[in-house]
C-alpha cells in the first residue's frame, strides 16, 4: 500500500536551488558522524595565555563571539608550549563548553594549517568523501543542531563531548553537492561581511562627524564647518532655549498597541533603542494608546521641533533624545520616563536632535545621572545644562542635512544586511531540515 505523501519522510534534495526537481535527483544518505570522521580534542591554553604576537590560536570562545563557518585566519596569539595541537587544514571544531545548550551546538572549519587548537574544543576530521564546511553547516543547523543541543549537559556551564557528536546521525548528498552548498553559503557570508563592513564604516563616520561638527567642551566653534560660515556659535542654558511645560504621561507598554488608535505615544524604550536622532512621525512606527483620544491629552500634544529626552536607562545612554518632525495631522504625546523640551525660537529641522545626542552635549549629562542599577536624570538638573548652536539657521540646516544623509545610508546598508541574513536563514532552514 502506498503511503500518503504527508506521511512520507521529506526527501533531502536541493532542486529549488540548483536544478529542477526530477525522479532522478539522488536522495541524501544518512550516516553516523562517528563513521565518517576521526575525533580528537584541543589541548591546553586559555584566554589568560593570549598575547599581542606569537603563534596563532583558536580558543572555544571565538565560536561564540566571532562565529564564522570557515575560519581562514585568526587575530589571537599565544606563546607556544610543548604538546600543542595544530590544525592541518579542514578540521571541524565544536566547542566542548558553553553557557547554553542552544549555543554550544555550532561548528566551524579551520581552513588554514598551523593554527593551535586550544582546550575545550572537539575536533572532527571528516574522511575524504565528506566536505568539511558542509559538515560544519550540518552540525550547526536543523535537526542535527537540535539533537546535539539536547545532549548538552550542565547548569551554569554546559558540556558537549566527542562521544555525543559521534552518536549523531545526519544526511549527506554527494561530495559534489556538498561542495556546491558550501560554496553557496560562502558567497552569502562574503556578501554579509561586505555589507557589515560598509555599515560599520558609516557608523564610525557618523560618530566622527558628531564629534567634529559640534564644539567640544570649552570651545565656541566646531573643528570642521561648512564653507562660508565663520561666526562664533551661540551658547544658552537649556531652560533659556527651551520650554519644559509640556507634560508627559506614565502609560506602560501594556496600555499601548501597534494596530489602531487616535493618539500615538513616544515610549522612552523606543527613544533609547528604536528611534534615531530625528523621529519622522509619518514614516517611523509609533505605538497607539489603547482606548484614549486627544481630548484626554490637552496641552500634551507634541509639535514639530519638540525634543524628547529619555530620562531613564540601564547605562549611560540615559539622556538620548529624538526630535519630532513631519507630524502633520498626527496626534502624538510623550510617554513614560521622558521629558519634552519645546524650542522657544524656531531652529533648523533636525539640528537639536543631532546636537543633543553628540558628545559635545551628552558629556554634561554624565555627572548628573543618579542611580546604581538604573540611571536617571532629573528635569531640574537637565535644565542647568547648556546648548550651543550657530546663529545662522542655514548652517544649522546644513549640519542636520549632512547627518541625516549619513543616517539614510546607514539604514540602507542595515536593511541590505538584514535581508542577506534572512536569505541565509531561509536557505539553512530549507537545506537542513
Summary of predicted features, one role per range:
Residues 21-42, 167, 225-249:
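Non-catalytic DNA-recognition/assembly elements of restriction-modification systems
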Residues 1-27, 197-234, 415-433:
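Short amphipathic coiled-coil heptad-repeat segments
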Residues 34-46, 61-91, 239-255, 271-306:
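Sequence-specific dsDNA recognition surfaces
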Residues 64-75, 92-118, 133-137, 146-150, ...:
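Short, ligand-facing micro-motifs at secondary-structure edges
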Residues 17-23, 44-45, 79, 155-157, ...:
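Short, recurring structural edge motifs at helix starts
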Residues 179-191, 195-198, 234-236, 240, ...:
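Extracellular/lumenal glycan-associated surfaces
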Residues 115-121, 152-179, 252, 259, ...:
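A short glycine-rich beta-alpha junction/loop motif
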Amino acid at each position: 500500500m502506498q503511503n500518503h505523501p504527508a506521511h512520507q519522510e521529506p526527501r533531502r534534495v536541493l532542486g529549488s536551488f540548483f536544478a529542477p526537481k526530477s525522479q532522478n535527483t539522488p536522495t541524501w544518505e544518512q550516516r553516523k558522524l562517528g563513521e565518517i570522521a576521526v575525533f580528537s580534542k584541543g589541548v591546553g591554553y586559555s584566554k589568560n595565555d593570549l598575547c599581542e604576537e606569537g603563534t596563532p590560536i583558536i580558543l572555544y570562545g571565538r565560536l561564540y563571539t566571532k562565529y564564522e563557518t570557515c575560519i581562514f585566519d585568526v587575530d589571537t596569539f599565544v606563546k607556544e608550549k610543548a604538546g600543542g595541537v595544530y590544525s592541518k587544514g579542514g578540521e571541524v571544531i565544536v566547542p566542548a563548553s558553553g553557557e547554553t545548550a542552544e549555543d554550544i551546538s555550532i561548528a566551524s572549519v579551520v581552513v588554514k594549517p598551523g593554527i593551535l587548537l586550544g582546550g575545550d574544543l572537539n575536533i572532527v576530521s571528516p574522511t575524504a568523501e565528506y566536505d568539511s564546511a558542509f559538515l560544519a553547516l550540518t552540525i550547526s543547523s536543523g535537526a542535527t543542531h537540535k539533537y546535539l543541543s539536547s545532549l548538552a549537559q550542565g547548569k551554569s556551564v554546559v558540556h558537549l563531548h566527542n562521544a555525543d557528536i559521534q552518536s549523531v546521525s545526519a544526511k549527506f548528498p554527494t561530495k559534489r553537492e556538498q561542495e556546491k552548498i558550501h560554496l553557496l553559503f560562502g558567497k552569502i557570508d562574503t556578501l554579509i561581511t561586505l555589507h557589515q563592513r560598509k555599515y560599520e564604516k558609516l557608523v564610525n563616520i557618523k560618530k566622527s562627524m558628531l564629534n567634529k561638527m559640534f564644539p567640544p567642551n570649552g570651545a565656541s566653534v566646531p573643528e570642521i564647518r561648512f564653507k562660508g560660515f565663520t561666526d562664533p556659535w551661540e551658547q544658552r542654558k537649556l531652560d533659556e532655549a527651551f520650554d519644559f511645560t509640556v507634560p508627559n504621561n506614565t502609560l506602560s507598554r501594556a496600555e499601548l498597541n501597534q494596530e489602531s488608535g487616535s493618539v500615538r505615544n513616544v515610549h522612552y524604550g523606543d527613544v533609547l533603542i528604536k528611534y534615531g536622532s530625528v523621529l519622522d512621525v509619518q514614516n517611523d512606527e509609533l505605538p497607539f494608546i489603547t482606548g484614549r483620544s486627544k481630548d484626554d491629552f490637552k496641552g500634551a500634544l507634541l509639535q514639530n521641533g519638540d525634543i524628547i529626552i529619555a530620562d531613564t536607562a540601564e547605562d549611560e545612554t540615559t539622556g538620548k533624545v529624538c526630535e519630532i518632525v513631519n507630524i502633520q495631522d498626527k496626534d502624538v504625546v510623550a510617554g513614560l520616563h521622558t521629558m519634552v523640551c519645546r524650542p522657544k525660537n524656531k531652529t533648523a529641522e533636525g539640528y537639536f536632535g543631532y546636537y543633543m545626542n553628540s558628545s559635545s552635549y551628552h558629556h554634561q549629562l554624565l555627572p548628573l545621572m543618579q542611580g546604581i542599577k538604573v540611571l536617571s536624570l532629573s528635569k531640574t538638573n537637565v535644565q542647568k545644562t547648556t546648548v550651543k548652536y550657530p546663529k545662522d539657521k542655514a548652517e544649522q540646516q546644513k549640519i542636520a542635512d549632512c547627518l541625516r544623509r549619513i543616517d539614510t545610508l546607514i539604514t540602507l546598508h542595515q536593511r541590505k544586511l538584514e535581508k542577506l541574513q534572512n536569505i541565509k536563514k531561509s536557505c539553512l532552514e530549507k537545506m537542513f531540515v
